[in-house]
Amino acid sequence: MNSLFLINESFTNGYISSVLDIISILAIFCGISVIVNKNPIISVLFLIGLFASVSSYLILLGLSFIGLAYLIVYIGAISILFLFILMLINIRISELQSNTNNSIPLTIILGISLSYSLFQLLPYDIAILSNFSSNINNNLYNLSMNKQNNGNFGINTTPAVSLQPKNNDLLFVTSKIWDGNLAESNHITTIGNVMYSNYSIWLFLASFILLLAMVGSIVIIMKSNASWGGALPNTRETKTEGR
């Protein structure tokens, strides 16, 4: 990433950073339990715990809108819908006792590939709080101010401001791309600008896929109702013939 800046971490809302590590470990445990458990109802319950841990992690980071969206959409709608459907379906005991160890290698491969792709994009946290890091802070700040003062022929006329953190605050790296804008503006404004400007095509594709899923489910239900309606008279005729 280009144009990296070191700024003070102020998004934990007063919480200790170790709480975020505990929530991350809890999310990993819930994700593994979703795959390992043979009972689908228990898997859905662990899935609800996974979504709850992710939403709490986002809320503690300061991304309150995204965390509440996770809480409302995934837990309040999708997970409860899965649980309701599984409670309505008559699950056989033989299916619950089936071996699911074949999916573990696929899960490991998908997890490694996803982690590798995320580590290439996400910035790393910096916990080195020394004079060297404070010097880097000041140098990067001066470079950014030099870029802004183009009318002064690249000469920085503002005094250098010491950005050395107080009370051993955590530092992190951000950039000028859209993920760093979440910390600088309103969350809803940033998400709207990103979705309807840079990723508008993907938004249209997602809405088209959802429309196809809705139409497909309606067609399947209509076909099943038609087949059931044609089968009912035959069963009645067989009953009358038997009498």
Curated annotation (Swiss-Prot):
Catalytic reactions of this protein: a ubiquinone + NADH + 5 H(+)(in) = a ubiquinol + NAD(+) + 4 H(+)(out)
UniProt-annotated location(s): Mitochondrion membrane
Main localisation: mitochondrion
GO molecular function, one term: NADH dehydrogenase (ubiquinone) activity
Pfam families named in the record: Oxidored_q3 (PF00499)
Residues that span the membrane, as ranges: 16-36, 41-61, 69-89, 104-124, 201-221
UniProt keyword annotations, A-Z: Electron transport, Membrane, Mitochondrion, NAD, Respiratory chain, Translocase, Transmembrane, Transmembrane helix, Transport, Ubiquinone
Entry GO CC: mitochondrial membrane
Entry EC number(s): 7.1.1.2
Organism superkingdom: Eukaryota
The keyword Cell membrane is annotated on this UniProt entry: no
Gene3D superfamilies from the UniProt entry: NADH-ubiquinone/plastoquinone oxidoreductase chain 6, subunit NuoJ
EC class name: translocase
Annotated membrane topology: Multi-pass membrane protein
Alphabetical list of InterPro entries matching this protein: NADH_UbQ/plastoQ_OxRdtase_su6, Nuo/plastoQ_OxRdtase_6_NuoJ
Family, similarity comment: Belongs to the complex I subunit 6 family.
Function, as annotated: Core subunit of the mitochondrial membrane respiratory chain NADH dehydrogenase (Complex I) that is believed to belong to the minimal assembly required for catalysis. Complex I functions in the transfer of electrons from NADH to the respiratory chain. The immediate electron acceptor for the enzyme is believed to be ubiquinone.
Record-given protein name: NADH-ubiquinone oxidoreductase chain 6
Species annotation: Neurospora crassa (strain ATCC 24698 / 74-OR23-1A / CBS 708.71 / DSM 1257 / FGSC 987)
Underlying gene: ndh-6
